[in-house]
Structure formats: C-alpha cells, structure tokens
Amino acid sequence: MAEGEDVLPLPTSSGDGWEKDLEEALEAGGCDLETLRNIIQGRPLPADLRAKVWKIALNVAGKGDSLASWDGILDLPEQNTIHKDCLQFIDQLSVPEEKAAELLLDIESVITFYCKSRNIKYSTSLSWIHLLKPLVHLQLPRSDLYNCFYAIMNKYIPRDCSQKGRPFHLFRLLIQYHEPELCSYLDTKKITPDSYALNWLGSLFACYCSIEVTQAIWDGYLQQADPFFIYFLMLIILVNAKEVILTQESDSKEEVIQFLENTPSSLNIEDIEDLFSLAQYYCSKTPASFRKDNHHLFGSTLLGIKDDDADLSQALCLAISVSEILQANQLQGEGVRFFVVDCRPAEQYNAGHLSTAFHLDSDLMLQNPSEFAQSVKSLLEAQKQSIESGSIAGGEHLCFMGSGREEEDMYMNMVLAHFLQKNKEYVSIASGGFMALQQHLADINVDGPENGYGHWIASTSGSRSSINSVDGESPNGSSDRGMKSLVNKMTVALKTKSVNVWEKVISFIENTSTPVDRHVSSSDRVGKPYRGVKPVFSIGDEEEYDTDEIDSSSMSDDDRKEVVNIQTWINKPDVKHHFPCKEVKESGHMFPSHLLVTATHMYCLREIVSRKGLAYIQSRQALNSVVKITSKKKHPELITFKYGNSSASGIEILAIERYLIPNAGDATKAIKQQIMKVLDALES
C-alpha cells in the first residue's frame, strides 16, 4: 500500500453510541474528515447524516453557490439530449408531481452549467445521470447538488474515462499484475476493460447497483479519500466473476462482456464489508508506483501527460520506479518487497549492479535455451529461499531490470514475455533500468554512510570504475561525481542469511563469459520496445494461442490480410527457396513462419496455429529494396533484414524484419545471390 494511506476497516456494531457522537460532531461544526473517520470506523452511515458526511468528505461543506453568477439559460446545442435524459431519470425516481418539475430543473441546470463552465460537450454515454442518482437521493439544494457533483467529477472520475481511454489500460495492467490467468483469457478473446468497465468507473457503480448498495459503496469510498481505490473495488468484482468466466469458455465475446458488465448488479448490502476488505488486501499488495506514476489521472492538475508516459496500452507490464525498489526492500514486516532480476549482459552486471539483484542473462534465451530454463528454475528457488530466510533481497514481487537502453532491453522483453506467458503474478519492470538507478543514486547524492544507500551498488569484477563506461555517461558533472563517490563505497553483493542458497545456484545464473556482441543497435530499431505489444505472449509454446489474436500488427489488419495454404505456396513454380523460421518482433514475441524467395520478392507467411496448414501473408518485400542483411557471431541464427532506398545522400531505412532461421548461413547466402541477380538485371 502506498505510504501514508489509511486502511479503513468495515466493522459492524450494535448500539448507537457512535451515531450520537457523530451527530454531535456534525452539529458542532468545523468537523474534518479525520474526525469523522475516527467516529464512524467504516460502519454503515445513518441515512439522515449521510448528506453532511459526504459534503465534508468532498470538502464542499459551507461552500458558496457556484451557480449564483449564472444566467440560468439552458441553450446548449445538445440541450434536447440533456433534457430528455433528465426527464427519463425523474420518471424512474417516482417523485411526487409537485416536486418533479423543480428537481428536473435542478438536475438539468447542474449538467448544463458544468458543461458550460468546463467547455464539455454532453453525451448520454458520460454516465453523469447515474452519477447524480445517489446525490439526488440526499435531497440536497441545487447549490450543494452542483458542488458535490463537481467535487466527485474532479477528484474521483479520471481523465480520459472513455472508450480506449488511459484509465482502462491502467486497469488491465493491474489485472495482469494480480490475476494474469484471467487477464490472459480476456486478452485472447480481445475483451478490453473499457468494453465492460466503462460505466463502472464513469458512474462509480451507480449505473448497475441499487441505490442502497451504491450509497454503501460511496460511504466507504468517500471516507477512504483515495481515488485509486475504485480500481481495487473493480478488481475484486472481476476476480469474483473469474471462476464463472473461465469455466464458460464456449461463450462468445459479446456474452462475456455482457456478463461482466452486469456483475456489480448482483452486489448486496451484506457484500460490501467483504468487498472493501478484499480490495484493501489487493491494494496492500500493489506497488506504490501504480498510484504515483498515474496521479495525474485524477484531480485538477494542469500538467500534461508526457507522450512517453501516456501510452499504457503498449506497456508490457506495470513499471516500478527505482526509488520504490530501493525503499521497499528496506521496509520491515508487511508491504510490497521486490525480488529484482537483472537481465543485462554478464559484463555489465559484473561491472556494477544492485547489490540485492539476481542475475539472469537474457541472452541465454536465444543462446542456450536449456541453460535459460535451468536458470529460471534456479531463480524461482532462490526467490523462495530468500523470502523464507528473511533476506533483504527477498520479495514476492518479481521486478525485471534492464540497462535502460531500448535496443538492448529487447532481450529483457523476451524474458518478461516468458514469465507473463506462464501466468506468473506480481511481475513488473524497473522503470528506466540500471541507468535510472545510477541517476537516482547520484541525484540523492550518495555520499556518506548516514544516508543508508552506500551499499546498494556492488561489483563482481575488478574494474569498479567501469560502471559509467558500461552504462553510459552521466548527463551532468554532479551526477558523475555522485556516481564516483558511490562506486568507492561498493561492498559485497549480498548481506543475507541465504548466501549458501545463492552459492548453490550461482553457476546457473552468473554468466561471466566474455562480453557478447550485441546484434542490435539504435539504428536498427523501428518503433520502441514496450510499444505495439499485445498482452498474450507466445514464446516457445506457440500452439497455446492463435497467433493472429496476439500480434500487434495483425490486430487491426487481420481482415485485410490474405490467408493462404502454406504447402500450395511452397510448391509454386516461381518459389526458388523456402526457409522455415520464426519471425521475431521488437517486443520479443516469436511467431512460426516461412520465408519464401521468388525471382524478385521475399514473402513471410506466418502460420495460423488454430488453422493447421494455413498462414497469413505477413510481409511482401521486393529483393531490390533490401539494403542490408546482418547477423552477429554470438547469434548467427538471428538475421536482420533492412529495407529502404539508396541514394547519393545515403540510405533511408523504411522497414526492418528479424527472423530466427535454422542454418541461417545457407539462407542468407541464397537470398544474397538472388538479390545480386535482381540488381544485375536492373543494371543491364
């Protein structure tokens, strides 16, 4: 749980002594939320005191009439829609006729003024009518109705609460973190959270729950005063439906969405205590970075969302700040603790690493799959032992750390994909990698034993001063000095009771071989890792999932891609060469494929695993557009093709494709020979 949060238990209590205390506190005036919490202690609120408690919780008690300066003219272009929706709402309330007209005007005025003051275009899909329902039941005067509505919109309804909006991509990452199996199932059916939870979040459940249940949820939620807590309430509702969803695999996508969307409607008053208790448990098992890195979703901050941070739809998993990683493992007792897995090459790890980090060289995944499998097994055993022994390195939560350089972290992405495919819970990535860790330690000026951070970086090689040369220059002089002072304080890697365990598995994990040449460079990449990555991963066990459902590039193009019979294409008279292979995406995904070479073109046919013998035509490239074919000594089977245009001013790269090809030497030789024939023909 994030630092400084209050856990509100929801006890039940007989007797009304606390209710009298609450009433007296409210009557006395000047009562704050903390005082109310101490009195209420999460118990169900008396109906006659709810309005006063909510106004204090929303910080609008005693606030003036925001509508006083408004002319009251209802003249928005969408006014007819607003009026119609308000009228339908009034009809559902069964309000006495003499009060209906006044209430109708109040609600329509609140919505109209909010639209005008915030420059928002109204639509029925916004769920505002549902959001107003619990407030209307409090029988508030118009000024209080508006102030409460405004406060809820401002503090508790996230920005971009719409189809494909950022709040729902964040919710998917939370589901994946805690319930990877459920997340994977929904992903394979292409069911995104916005398809079923849009109105959960947009109405804070008021759209589906009875007024009594909604009031009970809001009683606890508003006292919690944590806008992110709604995510955990939504998660529990989803988890509660998990068993039903997973046992009804034959249901269509639409049936599953409809079932999920209506799940909150089955909640009863008796369920609310358990709902909050479970939500608080999941909340306590969630890294603080979930909130801190997304705080701008809520509130009136004017700070924009940086482009690099904005695209949560393409995130592989939750990202954890390096400051949280350092702080979390210093905590005693309960709380999120991380088992850090350093996926950098051996020479970088040996030059300097987080002292509590476990080394898993991601190169092994391609270089030596059997050793990689053994390394993973050893890693999980070491994690278990470190937790049992109370080691400072121990933690339930796996956090993978790369270098922080995108082209190198492609390998780490493949390792991450492996763990996510296995439905491993509590999987995250260290934001910014080891470079961010270096920078953070330099920024907090690790200088002197009193700060407690001097032991965090360790070296297992002789060249301690090589950290900066391995992981990039510091952007400024002070950072560089900070790192040098830090390097001078390096100590042994692990101060732990489980040293023997680490020694037993070190032969599998600590690859101290000669430096490996990287075959990827910054000029090689198209797009970025963590981008265009769909959430179901297919590495090694391709038969588990239909690859057309997971590849990022096929998500929008499936309907347009041509489906062909693989054998028919291989047997075509114009096909000169056929190479079975695996297409390797920037994210680390690999897909069973076939490269076919004709006199003038190279085709990639990607197998459709659920339809044996068939494939998509994934790419079609003219041989004369190949400007470069590369491989590296340590990964000779991983071939990179670069396509583009050559001119006097240089080479313009238009596309890059990578393939894992058995007997790659024969394949590249044949392709190069065919390219030369094409070029010779063009010249002549």
Swiss-Prot record:
Annotated InterPro entries: Rab-GAP-TBC_dom, Rab-GAP_TBC_sf, Rhodanese-like_dom, Rhodanese-like_dom_sf, TBC1D23, TBC1D23_C
Region (May mediate the interaction with WASHC1): 514-684
Gene3D superfamilies according to UniProt: Rhodanese-like domain, Ypt/Rab-GAP domain of gyp1p, domain 3
Record-level GO cellular component terms: cytoplasmic vesicle; cytosol; trans-Golgi network
Keywords carried by this UniProt record: Cytoplasmic vesicle, Developmental protein, Golgi apparatus, Phosphoprotein
Chain positions found as Phosphothreonine: 514
Region: Disordered, residue numbers: 459-482
Subunit structure: Directly interacts with GOLGA1 and GOLGA4. Interacts with FAM91A1, C17ORF75 and WDR11; the interaction recruits TBC1D23 to AP-1-derived vesicles. Directly interacts with WASHC1 and WASHC2A/FAM21A. Interacts with FKBP15.
Domain Rab-GAP TBC: 44-225
UniProt region (May mediate the interaction with FKBP15 and WASHC2), positions on chain: 559-684
Biased composition (Polar residues): 459-479
Predominant cellular place of this UniProt entry's protein: Golgi
Entry superkingdom: Eukaryota
Signal peptide: none
Region span, May mediate the interaction with C17orf75, FAM91A1 and WDR11: 514-558
Modified residues (Phosphoserine): 300, 469, 474, 507, 556
Protein name: TBC1 domain family member 23
Domain Rhodanese: 334-446
Function: Putative Rab GTPase-activating protein which plays a role in vesicular trafficking. Involved in endosome-to-Golgi trafficking. Acts as a bridging protein by binding simultaneously to golgins, including GOLGA1 and GOLGA4, located at the trans-Golgi, and to the WASH complex, located on endosome-derived vesicles. Together with WDR11 complex facilitates the golgin-mediated capture of vesicles generated using AP-1. Plays a role in brain development, including in cortical neuron positioning.
Biological process, per Gene Ontology: brain development; embryonic brain development; neuron projection development; retrograde transport, endosome to Golgi; vesicle tethering to Golgi; vesicle-mediated transport
Location of the protein in the cell: Golgi apparatus, trans-Golgi network; Cytoplasmic vesicle
